[in-house]
Amino acid sequence: MDQFQRNGNKHRSWQQFFLYPLFFREDLYAIAHDHHLDRSSSSEPTEILVSNFFSFLTVKRSIRRIRKQKNSISLFGNCSPNKFLGCNKNFYSKLILEGLTVVLEVSFAMRSKHFIEGMDGWNSIQSIHCIFPLMEDKLPHSNYISDIRVPYSIHPEILVRIFRRWIRDAPSLHLLRSILHEWKNSFSRENLQKALVTQRENTRFSLFLWNSYVYEFESFLVPFVKRFSHSQSLLYGSFPDRTHFDKKIKHIVIFPRKISTKRIWLLKDPFMHYVRYGERSLIALKGTHLQVKKCRYHLFHFWQCYFHLWFQPYRVCSLELSKTYSSFLGYFLHVKMKPLVVRAKMLDDLFITDLITIELNPIAPIRSILFFLAKEKFCDISGRPISKLSWTSLSDDDILDRFDRIWINLFYYYSGSINQDGLYHIKYILLLSCAKTLACKHKSTIRVVREELGSELFTKSFSKEREFISSSFSKTRSQRERIWNSDISQINPLANFWQKIQNKQIEN
């Protein structure tokens, strides 16, 4: 596969136009088997037992069956090769799908790389860590923010149409069409979104379909945003001091090219800020109310004509930044108008200018966290701590570790919020709930638990090592700056949890 990827530029036609022979390479399914084995190593033991009896002879027979199939392909039916081994009926279907996905991913990666190289100024950072800089970003040129939810009622023919843009091999398209229809029918009446986004165990094939679908949406945003651009290209000379160079544009004198030996650069004002997680997207734009409505109309029109999908009006919400706040991934993004006085002196004249900058301040939703703790029986509706009765059968160390893990997850996720006092109120609730749980287990009181454990209740549970790390960083940094503890293993579950809650609130 590495050699296949390295020779991409030389044999690009084979990758884009003749993918069908690659679908029947046995080594690709060996790669898919290794990937499936690594991913399922921490799952059920039966899945690992099944993988030990994996047979490439069965894969060859499945490939031969696909090749000789005339009308339709039954990959998701009863395909258990050996009932004596108790093999999962979908095991070989998953491996075949992952083998097909390996070929599609390589070709898709080359196509996306070629597209990004052709688009100037398009930097796509595919990580959740790029969301946090947006929450601290300054929006000097934006006055509207649009909350977009990507539609997920995807028909298989729409996905086939997307593949036709970069796959010209007719047998490959017919094979993909048959697999997609069979794959959708395997979920009966469930929405395809549950298979793509909210499936309990996302397969490699489902993730590839969702990424391809969203890629088409984001690739449309590049020319779409350039059309509604309000910034003009400006020329400026290079400076030894590059700090806040965009504020010095008005004071630059452009010399003729015959005299100037400086390098001429091209600059565009940062008028747009875009971030996406899952099906939620936030776009900060500059323009009037009429222009934002036109932008919203063109987005509706594009989605209905290109994807043949009905775009519900509630999926796009455009609000003015100075009058409201938005919620994203469990944060409330509060907009703060910050006035700034600038004095500029030119010869004997003194000019005073008032500038207003827009800043986003992330706020932790304390009420929502209290509601979640009350739902999980850590406290009541009013926020009064109660004992966790379902944990009284555990050992003391397990109880302390579980409460410690809950607080660490919340502290990591909301470490950059401006309302840290509310987080310590949550910590106080968890601490008393932990003490009451231990007291209920030993049939004693909270005072007795504190006397027996002493400082161990506060050191072993709710350890302050991570808070000490943040405080040591804060000594060397400005007090206005915030520190984000970007632990990807703790961020993703909470982000998905708040995403589901907000989607239910919008739909209801």
Swiss-Prot record:
**Per UniProt, which keywords does this protein have?**
Chloroplast, mRNA processing, Plastid, RNA-binding, tRNA processing
Name of the molecule in the record: Maturase K
Please describe what this protein does.
Usually encoded in the trnK tRNA gene intron. Probably assists in splicing its own and other chloroplast group II introns.
Q: Where in the cell is it found?
A: Plastid, Chloroplast
InterPro entries in UniProt: Domain_X, Maturase_MatK, Maturase_MatK_N
Record GO biological process? mRNA processing; RNA splicing; tRNA processing
Q: What's this protein's family per the entry? A: Belongs to the intron maturase 2 family. MatK subfamily.
List the Gene Ontology MF annotations in alphabetical order: RNA binding
Cross-referenced PANTHER family, in alphabetical order?
A: MATURASE K
What does the entry list under GO cellular component?
chloroplast
Signal peptide segment: none
Q: A Pfam family name for this chain?
A: MatK_N
Where is the major localization of this protein? plastid
Q: Where are the transmembrane segments?
A: none
- Name the gene behind this protein: matK
